[in-house]
Amino acid sequence: VTVLLMSAISLSSASQHSHAILPPPSSLQSIGFGSCLEGQKSLSILSTITAAKPDVFIFAGDNVYAENETLDPKLASLREAYQQLSEAPEFQAMSESVPILATWDDHDYGLNDAGQDFPQRQASEQLFESFWGVPAADPSRTRPGIYRVVRIGQAPQAIQIILLDTRFFRTSLSKPWIPPLTGRYTPSEDPLQSMLGESQWLWLQEILKE
């Protein structure tokens, strides 16, 4: 069994999107992945990906950038970023022919460097899962966070793609007393510091035993 872990160091209903996300194929020979897709810039890279015809493509985080990252409880700017991507011809053509999986990082989570202290994290999760077509029956829909596993093929040639969530449960970063001299953050000595959170760690341990 091959294991691929993906992490990065959906609108109110799917029917509002002008795209559909294809499910993963039954077998794989090629996997594409990328991140940091700034919608304000050229999206021609998506046409290149479409032409390459990967069996599945993984958006690994920062898949959209809200124009105004704020604590807006309605996530208006983030919703608009998703809508713009949905309407982009390059993305529409890609999503029509290439199966897509996704995880997020801070900008498509909703706020730069945000973690578990982001007040809109649950609403952002709903946006993400709707936009990227996470199946209603997927176990990730029944728990906090977007982490999930996707299994493709049959043993002994099965592939297990593990999509981790490094934002929803991440504890706050340590900020220095004098940022200009030491940078935005400093190493933490807190033994409770976490990136995945306890529940995701326990889940990952069990998944890796399979």
Label each residue range with its predicted role.
Residues 1-10:
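Bacterial N-terminal signal peptides
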Residues 10-16:
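Intrinsically disordered, low-complexity serine/threonine-rich segments
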Residues 17-210:
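Metal-dependent phosphoester/phosphodiester hydrolase catalytic core
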